[in-house]
Amino acid sequence: MKKFGGVDYMGIDGLFSEDELAVRDAVREFVDEKVIPVIGKHYEEGTFPRQLIPEMAELGLLGSTIQGYECAGVNNVAYGLLNQELERGDCGVRSFVSVQSSLVMWPIYTYGSDEQKDHWLPRLARGEAVGCFGLTEPDHGSDPGSMVTRAERVEGGFRLNGAKMWITNGGIADVAVVWAKLDGEVHGFLVERGTPGFEAPEMKHKLSMRASVTSELTFNDCVIPEENLLPGAKGLGKALRCLNQARYGICWGVIGSAMACYDEALNYSLERVQFEKPIASYQLVQGKLAAMVNEITKAQLLNLQMGRLKDKGELKHQQVSLAKYNNVHQALEIARSARTVLGANGISLEYQTMRHACNLESVYTYEGTHDVHSLVIGATVTGIEAFR
């Protein structure tokens, strides 16, 4: 396979700092050397490449924006770029880092006690512990406020009952950030692996996100100690802030998938000869490639502006919704178009495109469905909430 050289039609690399490019290039090399050679096998077998966790930790990819606690402390643009490169390898790898960083380490750092931070954050940063995030339930997805998982006070702690569904990293997690209603209000809790009454069976037979661990979390009279309550995690809004952190990384990640598909289609079209000339010489194929690089370029600029706003503390969740709404849709369209350039070869695991396309079908839904984000944008521009 030809080495990936990036997609930069408008000279956008010149808008990044040296430090930001250094992070991107280090992760790009890691993906080329360690992820891409093994990911097809893991995708086919439905397994997550756990052997990559120590190397990702060594690169500082886990909780990378957090200051202290053995974390890298990079800015949000660099974090976006590392998500982009990871998903160029596979969405399952990017999802692992995204969940560990934005949905586990970030809420512990933001809402946790000093003791919780000291105990968990260094271990999570080193990859010695893995975390997951439990919000979605079997019957409560886009409306998490209607969750039925409950916590009640007992002597020395809390008793949890309920279930969570579609939980990334659940089956391999050492700790779960779980959201449950206590006295009618949503609170965040830490539930550790091995706690009696807590199980995390893996969900099998997926046709998407196959190189990612997806699990159900069940709580049957699961008693946790008082100190496992996240003291600052009171109210549904605190859970939604976590999702917005993860959603930011998704917006960058899917463009990594789009770049991989475009790059593969471009190289294939230059080598594939039909009617005595490369198919890249035909107007129909050139039109598809032009549309791909056009949408990638627009998404790159959107992501960069979003990252700069986030680094200044000015990014609004509605703006992240627009980026996810645009970028995931365009990445999926690029993957589908790239598959047509590859023809029948496009459905083979020998090529990347169909794997990315299948993964993007999940990303289109998780962390806020495409339709729900359209309602968020609609409410922002009209001032009228259609979903209330």
Question: What function would you assign to each model-found segment?
Answer:
Residues 148, 157, 161-200:
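A short core secondary-structure module
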Residues 215-241:
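A short, charged helix-loop
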Residues 1-91, 96-99, 111-116, 123-128, ...:
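Alpha-helical interface subdomain recognition
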Residues 110-112, 152, 178-181, 190-192, ...:
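Short beta-strand-to-turn element immediately C-terminal to the catalytic PLP-Schiff-base lysine
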Residues 74, 143-145, 169-173, 210-212, ...:
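Short glycine/proline-enriched turns and hinge-like loops at secondary-structure junctions
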Residues 124, 139-142, 166-169, 181, ...:
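Short Gly/Pro-enriched turn/cap motifs at secondary-structure boundaries
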Residues 146, 194-225:
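Flexible, small-/acidic-enriched active-site or ligand-binding loops
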